[in-house]
């Protein structure tokens, strides 16, 4: 099979951007598909660590710096009316036209922000392959979890009458084992890895460890005011 994977306009597909879940999804998806023997075209920026058949640069690092205007990449907006989104999506559309074949898949990670790409190729299958966001639009969606799939159903439809969509699927997130090496000699602590926001459960982790008198190590982006 042939996959055209569209990344984001404000990141590079390298481990330096591990804090961006969607960029990591792109990088790891490319790794898996190439590992299975498929053809992978990656539409991204200039730096890339994913094994692909071709990297197609749709936005330069200089353009990214101008777009972020001093902000961290995790604060970037998902809005296809912004200039850098127009540059990225526009170039992706042009470059896709040079490479697309009849049964190819267009894999989108930016939700509705990348809808213009799907609209440019209505006769191809555009798949939102890592839905962990709210702005869905396509007929073909792969959700991160059943909980999130049903949240989206309730968000856009009458929750008492949702029958789902035949082409929706759930494929949990995938990781690289070498990023989590086995430690045979254990130390006495608990570990929280994730964004520092309450909805991810940091309050529960903190409360449990406080009550049990145990050490808690926390790793992840952001700073929640509830952290003590």
Please identify what each model-predicted range represents.
Residues 1-228:
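Catalytic cores of nucleotide-sugar-dependent glycosyltransferases that transfer UDP/GDP/TDP-activated
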């Amino acid at each position: 099979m042939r996959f055209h994977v569209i990344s984001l306009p404000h990141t590079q597909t390298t481990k330096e951007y591990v804090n961006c879940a969607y960029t990591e999804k792109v990088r790891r998806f490319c790794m898996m598909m190439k590992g299975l023997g498929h053809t992978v075209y990656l539409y991204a920026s200039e730096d890339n660590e994913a094994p692909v058949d071709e990297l197609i640069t749709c936005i330069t690092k200089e353009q990214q710096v101008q777009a972020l205007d001093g902000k961290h990449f995790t604060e970037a907006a998902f809005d296809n009316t912004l200039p850098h989104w127009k540059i990225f999506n526009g170039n992706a559309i042009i470059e896709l036209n040079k490479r697309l074949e009849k049964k190819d898949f267009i894999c989108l990670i930016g939700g509705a922000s990348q809808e213009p790409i799907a609209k440019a190729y209505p006769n191809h299958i555009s798949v939102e392959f890592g839905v962990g966001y709210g702005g869905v639009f396509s007929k073909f969606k792969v959700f991160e979890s059943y909980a999130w799939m049903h949240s989206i159903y309730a968000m856009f439809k009458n929750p008492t009458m949702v029958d789902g969509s035949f082409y929706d699927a759930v494929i949990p997130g995938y990781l690289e084992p070498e990023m989590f090496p086995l430690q045979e000699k254990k130390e006495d602590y608990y570990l929280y890895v994730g964004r520092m926001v309450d909805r991810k459960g940091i309050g529960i982790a903190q409360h449990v460890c406080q009550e049990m008198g145990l050490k808690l190590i926390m790793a992840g982006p952001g700073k929640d005011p509830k952290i003590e």
